[in-house]
Amino acid sequence: MDIKEELEELKKKVSVEIDKSSSVDLIENIRVHLLGKKGDLTKILKGLKDLDPREKPVVGQMANKIRTQLETMISQKKHILEENKLDAQLASEKIDVTLPGETFQIGTKHVLQQIQDQIEDHFLSQGYQVMYGREIETDEYNFERMNLPKDHPARGMQDTFYLTPNVLLRTQTSAMQARAMDKHDFSTGPLKMISPGKVYRRDNDDATHSHQFHQIEGLVVGKKITLADLKGTLQALTDELFGKGHAMRFRQSYFPFTEPSLEVDISWNTVDKNTASQDIEWIEVLGAGMVHPNVLKMANIDPEEYSGFAFGLGPDRFAMIKYGIDDIRNFYLDDLRFLKQFCQVGE
């Protein structure tokens, strides 16, 4: 059999194989066995060197034509098989577009924001205003208007981040007291406000202290405001946040802007009349007291006619009690394993 006959026989054989092939893998095997380095067509073409020089152009042209025809047939068959495979796959993987799609992870309110919202809602229901102050405050409103003149020894109680000699990161939301009293028209009734926000002190971070923490200032100024009003206000707040059963303890303290001044502790654990005092674990949550007459005077309010109470509470500490968290630093570590425990319903 000469080369021409071999080429014609190969063309017929491969054409039949292409027609019968039923998968992309089979058609690829045909291509390799035909055109690969050791393929059938390659072997035949190696015999061209032994032909008479006059036959070489004729046989070479014939071989190239058959090669082109077979490559075209393989390509077309492969395309058909790929389309059939895709159609079969689509038919077997029907998508029900009425089913819900994949949900994306979304952010939720931080646990401290949740506590702050609960506290705000409580006081709004009691007729208070919510006033947001500035985190960068002046020395005048942060200290002087709070009865802390520049030479006052109590300034040493608070290590402060100063930006300039007269501008600082506020150390307390109490700075909002003077601004609120300056703006309020007392002819319309008493001033009742809370002011939530971040405060900054040069504290060493530990389990219960942080250089940056949240605080909510409360202030009521009006006629005949008493210490009993303050105690009742704080008891109502803790009962709503924690439920009844957490003991509250008032200790005498000192703050330059209140007189008398109190430290208020709340029990970690719930207690009843049978709980022994040594079994109660306390955590300090706020400072409070009656507004100092000097603070009222600096706001042009007559302390003989008006009185008031103020308190500053830490929502961080409230969250620790509410959820049994023993280290305040957990709130600021951005650990999703911790924070996801406090997702609200619907989030």
From Swiss-Prot:
Subcellular location: Cytoplasm
Reactions listed under catalytic activity: tRNA(Phe) + L-phenylalanine + ATP = L-phenylalanyl-tRNA(Phe) + AMP + diphosphate + H(+)
Broad class of where this protein is predominantly found: cytoplasm
TM helices/strands, residue ranges: none
Single GO molecular function: transferase activity
Cofactor note: Binds 2 magnesium ions per tetramer.
A single GO BP: phenylalanyl-tRNA aminoacylation
InterPro entries for this protein: aa-tRNA-synth_II (IPR006195), aa-tRNA-synth_II/BPL/LPL (IPR045864), Phe-tRNA-synth_IIc_asu (IPR004529), Phe-tRNA_ligase_II_N (IPR004188), Phe_tRNA_ligase_alpha1_bac (IPR022911), Phenylalanyl-tRNA_Synthase (IPR002319), tRNA-bd_arm (IPR010978)
Keywords in alphabetical order: Aminoacyl-tRNA synthetase, ATP-binding, Cytoplasm, Ligase, Magnesium, Metal-binding, Nucleotide-binding, Protein biosynthesis
EC number(s) per entry: 6.1.1.20
Enzyme class, broadest EC rank: ligase
PROSITE patterns (UniProt xref): AA_TRNA_LIGASE_II
CDD domains assigned to the protein according to its UniProt record, in alphabetical order: PheRS_alpha_core (cd00496)
Cofactor(s) this protein cannot do without: Mg(2+)
Binding site for Mg(2+): E259
One cellular component (GO) term of this entry: cytoplasm
Signal peptide (UniProt feature, chain positions): none
One Pfam family this sequence matches: Phe_tRNA-synt_N
Subunit structure as annotated in this protein's UniProt entry: Tetramer of two alpha and two beta subunits.
Family statement: Belongs to the class-II aminoacyl-tRNA synthetase family. Phe-tRNA synthetase alpha subunit type 1 subfamily.
Descriptive protein name: Phenylalanine--tRNA ligase alpha subunit
